[in-house]
Amino acid sequence: YLRLDGGVAPIYSEHLKDCPLSTDELFEAGQRNTDRAPLLHRGPIGAGAWALHGEGFFTASKAANLGAVLDEIDVGADAGVLFCLPHKHVLGLHPIDPGDPYWALKSMALLHCEETERHVDPMLSPFIFHRAPTGEVEAVAIPGGVVYDDPRVLILPAPLFDAILDAAGCESTPVR
């Protein structure tokens, strides 16, 4: 996005033809700006879940540098973390408990459903993602609504998260 006096606007390739910076340099500058974007809230929101909320367009973009975010807030993500990006103003995350990985999944499904139901912005991503301790990221589920306060999710094939479920003795049914 290009910052203007009246707000921001998307940048298209025709805007870049006379730009003295390379695409990589522009991405690095954008990531620095994203990392510096102020937050209204950064902290626990209950039951092990964390959320980063901001008014800017780039709060959800902090997921591109999730390793740095995890280092800053020290959530204890030794077994990995699940995260979601329901809209541009929030990044939700929950460290995985290797003994009960479904707890983090339910937590992120509930956060995703609550945020998309009560926020005026369109949904950014329908997925819940897993970030392994190695930094690898995979989509693991799609929230499908809440039935009697119990979030329903469609579990996707995700080899790294499936291994965590198997190690915990959890059943990886397609709908949970």
Where are these regions (language model features)?
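Short amphipathic alpha-helix segments
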Residues: 59-74
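Short amphipathic alpha-helical segments
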Residues: 22-26, 61-65, 100-107
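C-terminal structured domains
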Residues: 77-176
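Residues that form generic nucleotide/phosphate-binding pockets
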Residues: 26-33, 69-72, 167
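Generic structural signal for short, solvent-exposed loop/turn connectors between secondary structure elements
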Residues: 46-47, 74-76
